Amino acid sequence: MSLTVYNTRTRKKEPFVPVNPQSIKMYVCGPTVYNLVHIGNARPVVVFDVLFRVLKTLYPEVVYARNITDIDDKIMKAAKENGESISALTARFTEAYIEDMAALHNLPPSIAPKATAHIEPMIAMVAALVEKGHAYEADGHVLFDVQSMKNYGKLSNRALEDMLDGARVEVADYKRYAGDFVLWKPSADDEPGWASPWGRGRPGWHLECSAMIETHLGNTIDIHGGGRDLIFPHHENELAQSECAHGGEEYVRYWMHNGYVNIDGEKMSKSLGNFRTVRDLLQQYHGETIRFALLSAQYRSELDFSVSLLDQSKAGLDTLYGALKNAPATSTDAVDLSDNAGYLALLDDLNTPQVIAELHRLAKIVNKNEGQEAAIAAAQLQALGGLLGLLQQEPEAWFKATTSGSSELSAEDIEQLIVERKDAKLAKNYARADEIRKELTEKGIALEDSASGTSWKRI
């Protein structure tokens, strides 16, 4: 029983063989905190959270780092436009990011390093690259010389000339070659900056992740994840500067990248007006529903995110929680998933659609059986769901939960109406009792009367 992952570097699925089986090292690029994160930013967080959970079932220790980029030209621009300090802006959006990712049921990473706390190792890495002949100073900048690395482009599988077409490559007269990228840039007096051998300045975009990985995880890590849009130039340049700084030592053993998120069949963009922040979505949908939607496609595929998908995800979770609600009391502590089709699908490059299919199969077993067979299936259902970050609420709480921006009736209001309905029935005022049931139904509340009383759920 072993994990297989698709390696962007080799462009094929490979058995996962860690550098050190006693301690797995994984890094995922986090947000640049100048605004609220959108649903596309959330996909890699959810995907690699699932991988984090799976790895923890296989290895004694998994160290997962996901950074916060808190120094960047976009941050400086946003702070200036908002009339607030950079530290205030980044603190505000870092907090919002942490809250939003927690609302999507993501585990916190082992480490959440911030770029500004790693300026010294960044400067040290630049100095090493200059000393080894892989970087040069020009016009107050320090640039990486891409032609000094003979296999530059091995991650994105591009020739040097091809990389300049349509990529985020800054054109500047001071570069020896157009593809050279900035490691360190000068800062004006009114811009944030740090003292360095090349003058007061700040780090380039790519340098930050390399320095944080070196500091917390070492020169070689097992897995580096992120969105497909980061393959070039960001991850290509990360790889180049890290391997050249460390004498050619392998930087990352497995590169993993998730596909894009489209909105209603179109690329998500502010210009199209289909830009959806996680915070906006949480006003309308439970975080677990959004998470389920993000896992409905295999992570390397493009995901068409839509209201229809969210509604299907809500219905799917209703079905699964409904099975758990009616299941015999059980514990997931001693559940063995080693031969379960869903767990094996997770080990096969995180095939989450197959896992979801297995969850529904287990739910059917729970619904059609009683006693021990139903209890075993329910325990497997909850344990397997847990590896996806799903089905960890009490079923009763799921059916009664409201969204953060909801104008729905509160649980207290509903309970009060149920008491009023009960009193009306006792007083033989059946018209009022029926009126209350109708009122609740119209507001999406289903009542279920039984010998033990009246229960309710949102529909």
Swiss-Prot record:
Gene3D superfamilies in the record? Cysteine-tRNA ligase, C-terminal anti-codon recognition domain, HUPs
| EC supergroup of this enzyme | ligase
Motif 'HIGH' region is found at 31-41
The protein's matches in SUPFAM superfamilies, at most eight in alphabetical order, are given as: Anticodon-binding domain of a subclass of class I aminoacyl-tRNA synthetases (SSF47323), Nucleotidylyl transferase (SSF52374)
> What are the annotated GO cellular component locations?
cytosol
State the source organism's domain of life: Bacteria
> Known Pfam families for this protein?
DALR_2, tRNA-synt_1e
Q: Where in the cell is it found?
A: Cytoplasm
Query: Which BP terms does GO give this entry?
Result: cysteinyl-tRNA aminoacylation
Q: Which family is this protein grouped under?
A: Belongs to the class-I aminoacyl-tRNA synthetase family.
Question: What is the protein name given in its UniProt record?
Answer: Cysteine--tRNA ligase
- Organism listed in the record: Saccharophagus degradans (strain 2-40 / ATCC 43961 / DSM 17024)
| Gene name of this polypeptide | cysS
